[in-house]
């Protein structure tokens, strides 16, 4: 079916416009049961993976996931997940995205993100391979992909950030990394590996994310280690 898939905790919903009036006349719940909590850590950003599954991120605990096309409930922990577009299957995926954004590179490596550091993790070991042997302990499923959290924004900090950073009570509670007006990632999100051809060739394969609190788009060049 042609349409769009929406993540709206506790549901994942399929919408379609079948008569061309630009209004959805089909609404079908594919899955339900996800945790509802802080918006930035809710289920988000479904992206088609290179294996034909749709991947989505979440920073909260999952829940007991049900759906009309599932054979039974699927227990989901605090982890990202992947699912079939027809709602026939859903399962955990390696890693847990800390905020909005899901990114794949050209060879299928998946990157996760947190508000305080870009490209926090690369995910070299897919969970669906590791689960085949229940008698073997699961190793660490993520690898740190960046070793910095400082920023160098071109624009001046928002006035409210300056005011907040001058409040000693706020600084004492949250610490310098969260209260300095500029200089640290505090809202990194919306990551993407550039894989198109509109930008110059030198941009291909580079990593981008934004930090709205600092009016900044960050670019990093990825180098494989090993």
Q: Where on the chain are the PLM-derived regions?
A:
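Beta-propeller domains with acidic blade repeats across secreted/periplasmic ectodomains
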Residues: 1-226
């Amino acid at each position: 079916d042609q349409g769009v898939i929406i993540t709206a905790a506790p549901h994942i919903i399929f919408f379609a416009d079948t008569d061309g009036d630009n209004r959805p006349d089909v609404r079908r719940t594919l899955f339900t049961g996800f945790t509802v909590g802080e918006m930035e850590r809710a289920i988000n950003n479904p992206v088609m993976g290179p294996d034909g599954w749709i991947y989505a991120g979440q920073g909260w605990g999952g829940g007991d996931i049900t759906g009309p096309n599932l054979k039974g409930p699927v227990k989901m922990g605090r982890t990202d997940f992947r699912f079939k577009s027809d709602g026939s299957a859903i399962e955990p995926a390696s890693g847990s995205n800390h905020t909005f954004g899901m990114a794949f590179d050209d060879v299928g490596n998946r990157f996760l993100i947190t508000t305080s550091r870009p490209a926090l993790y690369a995910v070299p070991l897919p969970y669906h391979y590791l689960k085949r042997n229940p008698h073997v302990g699961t190793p660490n499923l993520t690898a740190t992909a960046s070793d910095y959290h400082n920023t160098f924004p071109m624009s001046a900090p928002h006035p409210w950030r300056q005011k907040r950073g001058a409040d000693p009570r706020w600084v004492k509670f949250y610490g310098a990394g969260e209260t300095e007006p500029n200089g640290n990632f505090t809202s990194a999100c919306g990551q993407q590996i550039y894989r198109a051809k509109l930008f110059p060739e030198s941009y291909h394969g580079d990593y981008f994310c934004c930090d709205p609190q600092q009016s900044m788009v960050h670019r990093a060049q990825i180098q494989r280690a090993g």
